[in-house]
Amino acid sequence: MLYVLHKLDDVELMFGGPARVCRSWHDAVCEPELWRRIDMRGRSLCFRETVSLKNMAQLSIWFSAGQCREFFGQHDVDNELLFLADRAPLLKSLHLIKHCDVSSETFAKAIMKFPLLEELELWECETHDTGIFDLVAMACPQLKHLKHVKDRGYSQYIWLEYPTDNSEALAIAKMHELRSLKLFHGGLDNQGLTTIIDGCPHLEYLDIRYCNNIIIVGVNSHG
């Protein structure tokens, strides 16, 4: 039964047919094993108009009974992130996706409670400052995979370039267990990149896109 339920996404699992079929199916839906991966992105179109993803997220976290290992958040997740931080001590993977609205204060409080975190993805989450990565480096010593995509601005259809800023690179260089790193639209320059490489001896995969302050000799970085 659990094998079948694993094939459903979170919204279908909680508010779809399985939870209403019979008592045994209802009980199975509440099994913590099914809630090790919680996804707030609301992929089930047929439920999006009637289901509060915020309520679903907190209920999913409750069902996980401390067993949640992976969490996907989108849009305003301040309350959900704090709720997760208090109830997911085993979390290993955190994804805050696409214009995710989370304050620096909330993120700082939450990240301190994820000491086992191995993967962090921040995609167009611009409400936290770069200093937060120093906190990540300290709070998550086992972090192995980091992806940070900035929401790059534009003016009259011309992409704006970021001024040189290596503060994020200096913090990332303290994440000594990193295996993969993806940085898009960052302000680091060659010196910042060198600092990361020197500080992350286990780095196996590096993906740096649209970081126009990095100059590769013999290559036009803007072309």
Predicted regions and their residues:
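The conserved beta-strand core of Leucine-Rich Repeat
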Residues: 1-223
